[in-house]
Structure formats: C-alpha cells, structure tokens
C-alpha cells in the first residue's frame, strides 16, 4: 500500500482552530493553517478585483481586515458542513496539491463525536472527494500512540474543547471520557478582556487573532497562582512587551499567567466546571480500580493549549494533592504535542497491520455511511 508517494495515505487532523494535514509516514504535517473561512464584509467596488465569495486559511487571515472570519467547528464538533467541505477542498487541492481520489484519507474526530457527524464525514469523503478508502480515528488515541504508549490518560486541549480520555491497550474507555468546553479560544477571549482592564482595546475578529498571538508567545502557568500574583504586584519581573502590527508597543504583566490560570480555575471566567486537573482526576476515578495506577503513571498532554510553560509541573502538583498519597504520578508533556494527534495518525496510517482497517469505497457503496461505526472505534 505504501508504495511511493503516489498512494501514500493522507492524514488530516481537523482541529477547531488549526488544520494539520500531510502524508502518512512523514514526521510532521506539511500543511498547518488556520481553520477559518472568511467572507467579505462589503461587496467589492474595484473592477477586476476578482473578489471571491470565500477565503480559506492563511488567505483569510491575511485579508482579515476586510473579512468576517468564521470557524466551522465549534467545541470540536463540526457545525457548518459547507464551510467544512471548503476547508477539505482547500487542504487537498491548494495545500497538499493531491487528488483525493488517489489516496486513502485518515481523518480525526473529537471524542464523543455525534454518530451523525461521523457518517457525514464519511459521506463527504466518498461522495464529494471520491476517496478510495478512509478511516476516522479519535484524536486522543492518536496522541497516545505518538507518545509510544497504548495505555494512559490523555488530556487533549485545543482551541475549542478539552477532553480527558482514558485509554487501555489502545481502546478509549467511553464511559470515562470527560469533556470540558473550555480551551484556547476561551483563554484568548479572557486575555482580550483583561487587557481591556489595562486600557488596551481589542474587539474585532481580526484583533482577536493578535491577542491569540500574544497569548501563545507570552503566557505561562504559575506553579502557585496566589504567590505569583503577590510577586507581580511588587516586582516588574513578570513584565514583557509586545509589538502590535502597527508598531505600537504594549506591556503585559500578571496577565501572562492570569490568562491560562482559567484552565485550573474556570470560575475565573464564570464557568461552573472543574479545572483540567480535577477533570483528569474525575476521569481516572470513573475507570476500573485495577487500571488507575497505569493511568496515573501515564498522563499525556496533547494539543496547542497544553503548550504553556509550567503546565506539566502544575498538573503534577495538583494531581498529587488529589490522588492517594502512595500513588506515583507522571505527567508527560512531549515537545511536539501541538501536533501529536497528527503524528499519531501518520504512524497509524503507515503501519502494515492497519492496512486492512481502512473502509474501502466498495464497502461504503454496499453499506452506506453507517459502516463507519462498524469499522472505526
């Protein structure tokens, strides 16, 4: 199957914020672009501008001043299929420059993805893009594979949603998966809000992208939040400056760690949810008592929102406080965790043992979209 580049499987990880796509067997995705579809705010006035009705990804990002930006995925689940189709089309034809009818495609999905959504993905792949074969894998399971494990609990936190997914011998345990509708986008929103308190105003969809960049470059997680706050009041050691696209320089201090603190204290943004540490603990407690030790010893972080410096130490500290005192706790934060879902997909799709797992076009034609529930679990 993996004979040369011509029929190399494609791996497409559809996050809420970024699309990661490339070829199975590669060690990193070739295309990473924002999952945005932008539509012009005003009708074109210049003749010959050749204005498109929609822009995707980086092009939408660069023209963001004149567009209204929309993300077709909300909280990890696809909410707008037309836009989703545009994004896949852009992925295959413009980014990877391949003909999807010549390659098997491995797609990823959020844990607890509604059944109808898996069927719709399957249908679009076979009917719109005519792929010869496809497969849908759960994001967290792929992250675990990428870390070289088959048992562990994955905390996957991206732009739209966070999940804790316990996995035993390669199978996700659905009864113990917990979902937290708190992720990168909420942190960006919170940072927009607390920067306003400093007198900086960020309001439009385009300005939100600037704040997201501030968050990614300067935020970190405090080991002891209260103590860090006290320090920041008396010393300027946490202050950093950031240059805006127009050349203006802003200073950001305690906001640096106040922003991601929301992951551990959702109440800071008025959410009545457990933080990521408590959600991880609750997820482990829903599992059989015999496998908990294996889970505590293999807590794997995955996704862009786990990229904050200090997250593994803080996670370790919080879980040690919750778990039985004799329990050995190990939090693993692989350096490539921003892309570990994609990397896991690349590994899986290139295994010789996986080749009989694909859903072939013939099987789809015979059984219809529901085949996805029988073949992908």
From Swiss-Prot:
It is found in: Cytoplasm, Cytoskeleton. Actins are highly conserved proteins that are involved in various types of cell motility and are ubiquitously expressed in all eukaryotic cells. Essential component of cell cytoskeleton; plays an important role in cytoplasmic streaming, cell shape determination, cell division, organelle movement and extension growth. SMART domains: ACTIN. It comes from the Eukaryota. InterPro entries: Actin, Actin/actin-like_CS, Actin_CS, ATPase_NBD. This is Actin-58. There are at least 13 actin genes in potato.
């Amino acid at each position: 199957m993996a004979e040369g580049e011509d029929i190399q499987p494609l791996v497409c990880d559809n996050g809420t914020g970024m699309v990661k796509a490339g070829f199975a067997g590669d060690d990193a995705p070739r295309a990473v672009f924002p999952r945005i579809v932008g539509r012009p705010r005003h009708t074109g006035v210049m003749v010959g501008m050749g204005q498109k009705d929609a822009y995707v990804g980086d092009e939408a990002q660069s023209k963001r001043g004149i567009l209204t930006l929309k993300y077709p995925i909300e909280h990890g689940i696809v909410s707008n299929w037309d836009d989703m189709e545009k994004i896949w089309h852009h992925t295959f034809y413009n980014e990877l420059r391949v003909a999807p009818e010549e390659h098997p495609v491995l797609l990823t999905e959020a844990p607890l993805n509604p059944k109808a959504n898996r069927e719709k993905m399957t249908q679009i792949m076979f009917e719109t893009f005519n792929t010869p074969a496809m497969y849908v894998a759960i994001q967290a399971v792929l992250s675990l594979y990428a870390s070289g494990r088959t048992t562990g609990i994955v905390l996957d936190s991206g732009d739209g949603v966070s999940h804790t997914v316990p996995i035993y011998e390669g199978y996700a345990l659905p009864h113990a998966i917990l979902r937290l509708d708190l992720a990168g986008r909420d942190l960006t929103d919170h940072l927009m809000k607390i920067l306003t308190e400093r007198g900086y105003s960020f309001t439009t969809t385009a300005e939100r992208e600037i704040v997201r960049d501030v968050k990614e470059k300067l935020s970190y997680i405090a080991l002891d939040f209260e103590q860090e706050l006290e320090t920041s009041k008396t010393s300027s050691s946490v202050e950093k400056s950031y240059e805006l696209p127009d050349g203006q320089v802003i200073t950001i201090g305690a906001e640096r760690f106040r922003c991601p603190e929301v992951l551990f204290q959702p109440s800071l943004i008025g959410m009545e949810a457990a933080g990521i540490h408590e959600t991880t603990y609750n997820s482990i407690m829903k599992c059989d008592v015999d496998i908990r030790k294996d889970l505590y010893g293999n807590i794997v972080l995955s996704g862009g929102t786990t990229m904050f410096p200090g997250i593994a130490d803080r996670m370790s500290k919080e879980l040690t406080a919750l778990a039985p005192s004799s329990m050995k706790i190990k939090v693993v934060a692989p350096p490539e965790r921003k892309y570990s879902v994609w990397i896991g997909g690349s590994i899986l799709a290139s295994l010789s043992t996986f080749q009989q797992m694909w859903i072939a076009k013939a099987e789809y034609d015979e059984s219809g979209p529901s085949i996805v529930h029988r073949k992908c679990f």
